[in-house]
């Protein structure tokens, strides 16, 4: 299964509380921090909500 590298590009400060919570639960602590997550529907849903804050790269296994 493919994986996604998600990088926080903009700060979550001054965003909606729901968006700040999603960023924190995703494991993104600071700007330019990255996490690798599986490419599934739940991950894609969070990325859709945070599209203006993150960049996504696909990693092939």
UniProtKB/Swiss-Prot annotation:
In the record, biological process GO terms are: translation
Spell out the InterPro entries in the cross-references. Ribo_uL30_ferredoxin-like_sf, Ribosomal_uL30_bac-type, Ribosomal_uL30_ferredoxin-like
Can you tell which superkingdom this protein's organism belongs to? Bacteria
Keywords carried by this UniProt record: Ribonucleoprotein, Ribosomal protein
Q: Which GO terms describe its cellular component?
A: large ribosomal subunit
Q: Which GO terms describe its molecular function?
A: structural constituent of ribosome
**CDD domains named among the record's database cross-references:** Ribosomal_L30_like (cd00355)
Q: How does it assemble?
A: Part of the 50S ribosomal subunit.
The family this protein is said to belong to: Belongs to the universal ribosomal protein uL30 family.
Q: What is this protein called?
A: Large ribosomal subunit protein uL30
Name the species this protein comes from.
Latilactobacillus sakei subsp. sakei (strain 23K)
């Amino acid at each position: 299964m493919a994986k996604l590298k998600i990088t926080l590009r903009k700060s979550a400060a001054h965003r909606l509380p729901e968006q700040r919570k999603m960023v924190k639960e995703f494991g993104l602590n600071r700007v330019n921090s990255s996490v690798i997550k599986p490419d599934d529907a739940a991950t894609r849903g969070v990325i859709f909500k945070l599209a203006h804050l993150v960049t996504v790269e696909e990693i092939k296994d």
